[in-house]
Amino acid sequence: MFKRKGALKVAMVAGEASGDLLAAHLMDALRAHRSDIEFAGIGGPRMEARGFHSMVPQEKLAVRGYSEVLKSLPELLKIRRRLREQLLEERPDVFIGVDAPDFNLGLEAGLKKGGIPTVHYVSPSVWAWRPERVQKIGRAVNHVLCLFPMEPPLYRQAGVPVTYVGHPLASEIPLEPDREAMRDQLGLPQGVPVFTLMPGSRQSELEYMVPIYLDTARLLLRQYPEAQFLVPLATRATMDQFEQMLYRFKARDLPIRKLFGHAQMAMIASDVVLVTSGTATLEVALTKRPMVISYKLSALTYRLVKRKIKLPYVGLPNILCGRFVVPELLQKQATPQKLAEEMQRLYTDSAARADMEKAFTELHLALKQDTATRAARAVLEVARCH
């Protein structure tokens, strides 16, 4: 896995597209501090483009929901066991688990017990549900890196070393994105409605959300015959899956433009975004675009999750703003008709768009820190002290 003698060995696991982005930024910042550094573990395309050696494809870990995870559990446990054994043998200087707590915390606990310093980057949503996880996380890791300002006090109260680093997207995305320039860059006409559809980064999410989003696009197209639809997809696997679903659901006739990556470009260029709940909702908020949040889980998973959620909303922008800034249509409410109606409302209601933009700008300013540099310093300190 690690090949260069004398280099600082950093092991990482990033379980999905959002973690791939965070880890890629962190790799850049670590290299700015140390040129003699090598990265390996499990990561995505952005990490691999920076020289990361991934033991298995990142998509293997991108599974959501209780019932869905159960189907993949034997393979996930096998991957984690193999990786733990390999890392205990190769002895990296530090391990960084980027998000993916269900996979990473067990791995981190085993590595920490074996004397390898561990850092967990991105706190699980302990402020929303299962707050008892703070103690479990503290036992598994030497340090936690938090993206949101309400998180560090929860860890400090439990005696867990923690650093608030802000969110890297807040530094990467301009405070005032230029929609017209982005449309020119993408070759899109200025005078037509452009809607971005973001069905998710996990293959299991696409299976649930793509059929609904395609029907939503059909309804919007009836209202706006000149409309264009952008669909950014994070990996080759999800690109192929989406292409197959276009055939399966007889949607090849829709004016859909698929983008490999380039999610921010699609967001900025759009009038309204339809997005599956997750980290992408924060990215849309930082681009100041109006959005509708949707999500659909299996009935079993939804019942289990609903009992444990402590907040009235699930979308990150609403959680961070402390109110329903963005409409959320979940489960039985996630119908093409209702989604299309909300998107049409946001497209035509300038006051609603202005309210969202104001809230998103305030959120952007609060999250804008030198995230990757702060995270890199904390990681190097953990590696040095342990």
Curated annotation (Swiss-Prot):
Pathway: Bacterial outer membrane biogenesis; LPS lipid A biosynthesis. Coiled coil: none annotated. SUPFAM superfamilies: UDP-Glycosyltransferase/glycogen phosphorylase. Its EC number is 2.4.1.182. It comes from the Bacteria. GO terms for cellular component: membrane. The keyword Glycosyltransferase applies. Belongs to the LpxB family. This is Lipid-A-disaccharide synthase. It comes from Chromobacterium violaceum (strain ATCC 12472 / DSM 30191 / JCM 1249 / CCUG 213 / NBRC 12614 / NCIMB 9131 / NCTC 9757 / MK). The gene is lpxB.
